[in-house]
């Protein structure tokens, strides 16, 4: 991947959507919910404060994170789907 986020942005690879219900029924593409978690694949340099100091990012490549249902901008690169979002759009890190 050749995407490098700027400032306090991160690039997240969303988890795949559920293919079937717990009862075993297959979900059509139109009925699938977008996942609200994924893995960070790239991290920007950090947010620039008003005094010019760069604030270090709190997330790292490879971490699994939770984010809002409508967070980020969807992009497709080389056939892969990604979300570009600000670090502040991330709610939590999954251990």
UniProtKB/Swiss-Prot annotation:
Its main location: cytoplasm. InterPro entries: Chaperonin_GroES, Chaperonin_GroES_sf, Chaprnonin_Cpn10_CS, GroES-like_sf. GO terms for cellular component: cytoplasm. It is found in: Cytoplasm. Pfam families: Cpn10. One of its GO terms (biological process) is chaperone cofactor-dependent protein refolding. Keywords: Chaperone, Cytoplasm. The keyword Cell cycle does not apply. GO terms for molecular function: ATP binding; metal ion binding; protein folding chaperone; protein-folding chaperone binding; unfolded protein binding. Together with the chaperonin GroEL, plays an essential role in assisting protein folding. The GroEL-GroES system forms a nano-cage that allows encapsulation of the non-native substrate proteins and provides a physical environment optimized to promote and accelerate protein folding. GroES binds to the apical surface of the GroEL ring, thereby capping the opening of the GroEL channel. PANTHER family: 10 KDA HEAT SHOCK PROTEIN (PTHR10772), CO-CHAPERONIN GROES (PTHR10772:SF58). Heptamer of 7 subunits arranged in a ring. Interacts with the chaperonin GroEL. Belongs to the GroES chaperonin family. This is Co-chaperonin GroES. It comes from Prosthecochloris aestuarii (strain DSM 271 / SK 413). The gene is groES.
């Amino acid at each position: 991947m050749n995407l490098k986020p700027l400032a306090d942005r991160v690039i997240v690879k969303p988890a795949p959507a559920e293919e079937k219900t717990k009862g075993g029924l297959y979900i059509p593409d139109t009925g699938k919910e977008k996942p609200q978690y994924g893995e960070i694949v790239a991290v920007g340099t950090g947010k620039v404060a008003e005094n010019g100091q760069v604030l270090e990012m709190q997330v790292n490549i490879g971490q699994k994170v939770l984010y809002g249902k409508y967070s980020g901008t969807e992009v497709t690169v080389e056939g892969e789907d990604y979300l570009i979002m600000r670090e502040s759009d991330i709610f939590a890190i999954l251990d």
